[in-house]
Amino acid sequence: MVVKIGILKCGNIGMSPVVDLCLDERADRNDIDVRVLGSGAKMNPDQVEEVAKKMVEEVKPDFIVYIGPNPAAPGPKKAREILSAGGIPAVIIGDAPGIKDKDAMAEEGLGYVLIKCDPMIGARRQFLDPVEMAMFNADVIRVLAGTGALRVVQNAIDDMVFAVEEGKEIPLPKIVITEQKAVEAMDFANPYAKAKAMAAFVMAEKVADIDVKGCFMTKEMEKYIPIVASAHETIRYAAKLVDEARELEKATDAVSRKPHAGAGQILNKCKLMEKPE
C-alpha cells in the first residue's frame, strides 16, 4: 500500500524545508507518495485559502500536514478552518506562538506539533537580506536536527503513515516539543552531549524572544538592528553547541541513527560500521 501525504507549506519556519525530506531521506521509500503545495514566504489568508482548498479538493491525500509560522495568525487560521471542514485528517506544525491556540486546534479536530526551539527570524530590512536569511535557517535546521526536535516531528508523521498502512484510525498528534521531549528522541549516550543539546534548545527558544523585541517592540533603528543581530549570533552559537554534542557522541562511536527501510520501517543503529536493524 502507498500512503499519499499532502504537505502545505505557507510561510516558513526552520522545519519547513525538511519536513517532507525527513520522511524519505534517501528517496527510496516505496510506501509513501508526497505532494507539496505552498504559498512561498507569505501566508496571507487569500493565498493560504487557495492552496489549502486545492489540497483538500484536488490532491485528496490520506492525511495533510500544514506547516508554517504562528498557527494563531489570520492566514493559518484560514487553513485550519478549511482543513477542519475538509474531512481529511490533518496536523498543524508550527512554532511557539501556536501554543496559545493548541486547545482550539484540538477542538477543531486537528492535530498539532508545536516546536519551541524553532524561532522567529530577525526580519528587519536594515539587517535581513537573502544571505542572512539562509544562514539563519541553516543554523535553525542544525538545532532542530541535533537536539532531537526534528526526530519528534518525523516520528509523529510516521505514526500517521503506519496507521493508514495498518487500516487503523489515524492518530492526530498533540505535541509541544520541549527540550526534554527533544533530547529523549535522540537517545544520547553521553550525558554531556545531552546537556549541550538541551542548552542549544533553550538558546534557540530565547532567540525568538529577542527577535520579537527587535521586530515589534523597538522602534528606533539604532536600537533594533543590534537586537536582531544579537539573536542571529545566539542561534549561531546554539548550532555550534549541537555540533559539539554530536562530536562527543562520535568520539565513543555512539551516534544514534534511525534510517527508514525501503518499506518504511524505522531502523536503528549506533555503531558507525554496523548495519541498521
From Swiss-Prot:
It comes from the Archaea. The keyword Protein biosynthesis does not apply. Keywords: Methanogenesis, One-carbon metabolism, Oxidoreductase. It catalyses: 5,10-methylenetetrahydromethanopterin + oxidized coenzyme F420-(gamma-L-Glu)(n) + 2 H(+) = 5,10-methenyl-5,6,7,8-tetrahydromethanopterin + reduced coenzyme F420-(gamma-L-Glu)(n). Gene3D superfamilies: 6.10.140.120, F420-dependent methylenetetrahydromethanopterin dehydrogenase (MTD). Its EC number is 1.5.98.1. One of its GO terms (molecular function) is methylenetetrahydromethanopterin dehydrogenase activity. Pathway: One-carbon metabolism; methanogenesis from CO(2); 5,10-methylene-5,6,7,8-tetrahydromethanopterin from 5,10-methenyl-5,6,7,8-tetrahydromethanopterin (coenzyme F420 route): step 1/1. InterPro entries: MTD (IPR002844), MTD_sf (IPR036080). The keyword Oxidoreductase applies. One of its GO terms (biological process) is one-carbon metabolic process. It holds the Pfam family MTD. NCBIfam families: PRK00994.1. Belongs to the MTD family. Catalyzes the reversible reduction of methenyl-H(4)MPT(+) to methylene-H(4)MPT. This is F420-dependent methylenetetrahydromethanopterin dehydrogenase. The lineage of its organism: Archaea, Methanobacteriati, Methanobacteriota, Methanomada group, Methanococci.
